[in-house]
C-alpha cells in the first residue's frame, strides 16, 4: 500500500515538473516602447470659432526614437486629426470640450498612450467691446473681440451681418444682461425698437416694437430705453409722449404705461403733469425720474389703491422736496458709505447754470443738506456727456468738445468743482460718449473725428486716474453713442 502511494506521488512530481517547463516556454517577454507626450498645456486652450487650433507636441520613445506611431486627436470623442502635431480649423460650436491626443503602437493597437486637455471654443462674439454708434443717422453695432485679436480687428455692422436686415430709428443704448434675468443676452435699443440678441451668435431672439405694449398696438417712438438697471432686473422706456413704459425681466411685453397726468402720493385727488429727462433709475415696481416741468425728482410707483389696467402700472408719484430747476444731464452710481447711492448732474444750456446732486438715494432723497451744489466754475456746454466712476467716486464730464473735466464726489469741502482731466486726445475730435470700465480702472472715451471718410468714430481707452491713453481703436464705427464690455456666456447653442 505504501509502495502504491510512493509511486503515485512520484508521477505527480514528474507531471508538475513537465508542466512548469512547458508553461515557461509559452511566455514571450518583449520590452514595450513607451511613449511620453509633452507640450500640451494644463490650462484650457481658448480659441475662436473658425480659427486654427495649433498644438505642437514632443514625443519621447523609451526604445526606438524612429519608431513608427499612429496618432489621433479627439474633441469630445470625435476624431479631428491623425497627425503628430495638431492643426485644426475649429468649426465646432462655442462651448468647452474634453480633448485627447492619443498615440498607438502599430504592432499592438491595444497599447495606447494619451494626454487629456480642455478646449474652450468661443464664438467670434464671445468677449469684447460692443459699440452702438450713429452712422449717417442710422444705428450701427460694431464689435471688437478681446480674445486672440492682437491687431484689434473690428467687425462693423454686425447686427445686419447676422440678421440680414438693418436697425431703424435713432441709437439709444446697448447693454448685456446678467445671467439670472435674461441669460446674458444683449439688448440694442433704438427709438424705433429694441432687439434682444443671442450672446453667442448675435441672432435676434426677441423684438420689442409697436406690438409689444400692454393693450392695442401703438406708435413706438422712444427717447430712452434700458431693460436692466444697476441694481434690479426691472427696466423701462420713455416715449416721445413722455410716458413711462416699465419692463420686467423675462416678460415679452411692456407693462401698462404710466398715468399722465398722475396722482400725487398722499393726495389722490391731485393730478400733476410731467416732462421727464431721458433717463430712469428702476427699482422693483417703481422708478425714479427727473421732471423738467417741476424741476424735481419724481418717484413713480403703484399705489394698489387706485384702480388701474395693470397691477404694476405707475399710477402715483412722490415729488421730491428739493427744488433743482435745471434739466438733468445724467446720473451714475457711486458707493459712498459702501451703499448704493447715486450722483446726478444738471445743466441748462439756455441759462448756462449747472448743479450737482453729489449723493441721493434711488428714491430721489438727497443725502444731507450739502449734497446739492450749484456749480459756479463749471465747463459744461451743449453736447456735454458724463459718467460716474463708482470705484473712486469721480464724475467725468466733457465740455462739448475734446476736453475732459473731473469732479471729486468724495471731497468733503468740494473746493475744486471742476478739475481738468488731461488726456492727449487729438484736436480734431468731439467727445460723444464716456463709459467707465467694469473694473473701474479705465475710461472709454468715444469721439467723433473730422476725417473725410466713412467711419469717423474712434474709441480711446484711458487710465481712469491720470488720463494716460492705454488703447486707441480707430474707425470703430460712426459717432459713438454707447458701449458695453461684452462678457462670454458658456452654453451650447442650437444653430
Predicted regions and their residues:
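Acidic/polar, low-complexity intrinsically disordered N-terminal segments immediately downstream
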Residues: 21-162, 436-440, 448-495
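Conserved blade-ending motifs and adjacent loop-strand segments that build the rim/top face
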Residues: 372-384, 415-438, 466-482
